């Protein structure tokens, strides 16, 4: 049973005419809709059972790289949606073959890195951001950044960030990543610093050598400012 806007929907199997007669008599109303289950149509009970099995499969799986590609999953009206960092046919096949397969699965996520040519500032009014090292290995799981505050006042920031990379054609694109962040506010006092780490997910999508940009928003005098720090990845580090 579920609501489609204001309409009550009963999911049934078998004879819908008989089911409607029984439900109309029991409820004293005709203001509902029947949805025939069977074949590729799953009831909520069936979907919940499949999700329970999926929970177990994911917990027991040793394929950490495949699990890291999953940002979440849940029961919808007719499918179980599985959200992936990289949602290519190859990644879907990998999940179905090594974690679990079901016709009820529906995948969502980025199929190709999104173009993002945005730029930010790396210093403003005594506030500046820099990578701990200018160059990291393409195999690096994380990159560390330092945000320094010498503005004479306090600044605010959070956990959210994103990373872009320059592709072989010189176009800047967003690095696929888990975009779910805990909502926390930090206050950085004058002459203090904050250390941040950005995950690069090399086990989900092998990163190429080249230029990368880290973006991080801070609030200065109640105004948001997009900070940016550039770094490189190298095969030789």
Q: Locations of the language-model features?
A:
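A short tyrosine-centered beta-strand micro-motif
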Residues: 207-218
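Short proline/glycine- and acidic-rich turn/helix-capping motifs at secondary-structure junctions
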Residues: 34-52, 107-119
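Intrinsically disordered, low-complexity Pro/Gly/Ser/Thr-rich segments with frequent PxxP/GP/PP motifs
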Residues: 178-205
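A charged, solvent-exposed segment within the mature domains of Sec-exported extracytoplasmic proteins
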Residues: 56-117, 222-236
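Short beta-strand segments enriched in hydrophobic/aromatic residues
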Residues: 86, 200, 218-220
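Primarily secretory-pathway and cell-envelope proteins
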Residues: 113-182, 187-188, 217-237
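Short glycine/threonine-rich beta-strand-turn micro-motifs
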Residues: 1-47, 63-98, 143
